[in-house]
Each structure stands twice: as structure tokens, then as C-alpha cells.
Amino acid sequence: MSQTPMPQPDQAPPVDVGQPVDEAEAKRRRFKTHGRKKGKVNDTRLARIEAGLLALSLPPGSADRGALIDQLGGNGQSQRVILEIGFGNGETLAALAARHPEDCFIGIDVFLEGFGTLLNRLTRGDISNVRLVCQNALQVLLERIPDASLDGVIINFPDPWRKKRHFKRRIVQTEFLDALAPKMRSGADLTLATDWANYAEWMVAHLEPHTAFVNQAEPGPFAAPPPWWIETNFERKGVAAGRIIRHLHYKKR
């Protein structure tokens, strides 16, 4: 086994002193999303993952939603573009893509092991409506997703970064929501789930005052599981440990 050479999306490229930095780059430097990237993958599996990522990659530069759908392999019949941030082992992403072949799906993560498992699921299920990116989520939003393109965003069980000094690493932050909001169409769904009570409260504290999102839970703040909800191995472990799964459902104004 060899140590997996993981990408380092949080490292901004050097810029010559005196050179202007565009707005997207400046925003990416101010706020970085984090994921735990440690792990080992043997060379054979790594080669397969890299080949799979190359085949299913989402290149940057789509000018608008139509161009994005073209890059995703969709057509005029494509109904929705759904993004999952942090898909883990790909249970939800693969299942939803199989259920809805008319839709286009994008998965973002930084775990190579998870990509390997998801790629196997896609191959076994003959699922072709998924594109994948192994990169920092904020960077993907700024560089690869045109404005008003996403019909749904799923963030299930993001790393809670439980130590207070690490709270700044949590993905749900005001600046992240500021970057996400313009990428979503009006009426698009943002669904989140966590098994850590403190993080659930943190999510609510950041989403409730945000002017771009409206809580759909009644009476709230937490929602019932969405109709499409798929129980994952990660969820089962949390429940077995005695933790409560809390769901949030917001719509983009």
C-alpha cells in the first residue's frame, strides 16, 4: 500500500506581487471549505479511480445552464441539475441518478476512496448521468458552475469539525452560502442533514438570517426527511451510536 497522493485544493497558486487578483480568486482565498483527505489507496485502484474521474470529469468554463447541461451529457429532455457536496461512498448520488435518468447529477468530494466506491456503483448500475469533481467545493462553485444553473443541492453529513477552534472549517458558513446562492435557480431546493446537534444548530444560525434562502420546515427549524431520502451506512452508524439525524430544507428565493 502506498500513501495516496491527494490533491491539495486549499492551496492557492502564487500570484506575482502587484498582479491583480480577480474577484472569484479573492473570494476563494478568503474562505476555504475543508475535508479530511487522509487515506490509502493502492496503485492499481488509484489508476482506476483516476481513469474514472477523467472519463466523468466536469470541465470548467460553462457559460450558462444550457452549456453546463451539454457538458453533463444531458439533452433537451433534461429536467434538473442536482449537485451533491460530499457524497461519501456515493450511496445517495448513485441511487438518485438511477431513479432519475432524465436529470443531470454532479458529485463533489475530496476522498479518493469514496470516488472508487461510487465509480463501482455507477458501473454496476450502468448509470451515465453523473459527473464528478475531486476538488474544493467552493472552488468548483466559482469555476465550474454557471449562475442560476442548479435545481437542487444536497449536503448530507458534512464533517462537523467538533472542536471550537475548527468551527471555521465547517462548510456551512455565510461566505459559502453567498457563493452557493447565485448558482441556484429560484425555487431550487437546498437539503442538509447532520447527526451532530451542535452542527444542526450552527446550520440554522447561518441559514435563517440569509436573505437568499427560505426555510420550508413547519413549524421548523428542522424538517422531515425529504421524500427521496436514502438511508446510508453513515446514517446507520450515527443512529447506532445514539445520535439523532436532523434534516433541514430551504428553498432559494
Curated annotation (Swiss-Prot):
<dbReference type="InterPro" id="IPR029063">
    <property type="entry name" value="SAM-dependent_MTases_sf"/>
</dbReference>
<feature type="binding site">
    <location>
        <position position="84"/>
    </location>
    <ligand>
        <name>S-adenosyl-L-methionine</name>
    </ligand>
</feature>
<feature type="binding site">
    <location>
        <position position="109"/>
    </location>
    <ligand>
        <name>S-adenosyl-L-methionine</name>
    </ligand>
</feature>
<feature type="binding site">
    <location>
        <begin position="232"/>
        <end position="235"/>
    </location>
    <ligand>
        <name>substrate</name>
    </ligand>
</feature>
<keyword id="KW-0949">S-adenosyl-L-methionine</keyword>
<keyword id="KW-0489">Methyltransferase</keyword>
<keyword id="KW-0808">Transferase</keyword>
<feature type="binding site">
    <location>
        <position position="163"/>
    </location>
    <ligand>
        <name>substrate</name>
    </ligand>
</feature>
<keyword id="KW-0819">tRNA processing</keyword>
<comment type="similarity">
    <text>Belongs to the class I-like SAM-binding methyltransferase superfamily. TrmB family.</text>
</comment>
<dbReference type="GO" id="GO:0008176">
    <property type="term" value="F:tRNA (guanine(46)-N7)-methyltransferase activity"/>
</dbReference>
<feature type="region of interest" description="Disordered">
    <location>
        <begin position="1"/>
        <end position="39"/>
    </location>
</feature>
<dbReference type="GO" id="GO:0043527">
    <property type="term" value="C:tRNA methyltransferase complex"/>
</dbReference>
<feature type="binding site">
    <location>
        <position position="159"/>
    </location>
    <ligand>
        <name>S-adenosyl-L-methionine</name>
    </ligand>
</feature>
<comment type="function">
    <text>Catalyzes the formation of N(7)-methylguanine at position 46 (m7G46) in tRNA.</text>
</comment>
<feature type="active site">
    <location>
        <position position="159"/>
    </location>
</feature>
<feature type="binding site">
    <location>
        <position position="136"/>
    </location>
    <ligand>
        <name>S-adenosyl-L-methionine</name>
    </ligand>
</feature>
<feature type="binding site">
    <location>
        <position position="195"/>
    </location>
    <ligand>
        <name>substrate</name>
    </ligand>
</feature>
<dbReference type="InterPro" id="IPR055361">
    <property type="entry name" value="tRNA_methyltr_TrmB_bact"/>
</dbReference>
<dbReference type="Pfam" id="PF02390">
    <property type="entry name" value="Methyltransf_4"/>
</dbReference>
<comment type="pathway">
    <text>tRNA modification; N(7)-methylguanine-tRNA biosynthesis.</text>
</comment>
<feature type="compositionally biased region" description="Basic residues">
    <location>
        <begin position="27"/>
        <end position="39"/>
    </location>
</feature>
<feature type="compositionally biased region" description="Pro residues">
    <location>
        <begin position="1"/>
        <end position="12"/>
    </location>
</feature>
<dbReference type="InterPro" id="IPR003358">
    <property type="entry name" value="tRNA_(Gua-N-7)_MeTrfase_Trmb"/>
</dbReference>
<protein>
    <recommendedName>
        <fullName>tRNA (guanine-N(7)-)-methyltransferase</fullName>
        <ecNumber>2.1.1.33</ecNumber>
    </recommendedName>
</protein>
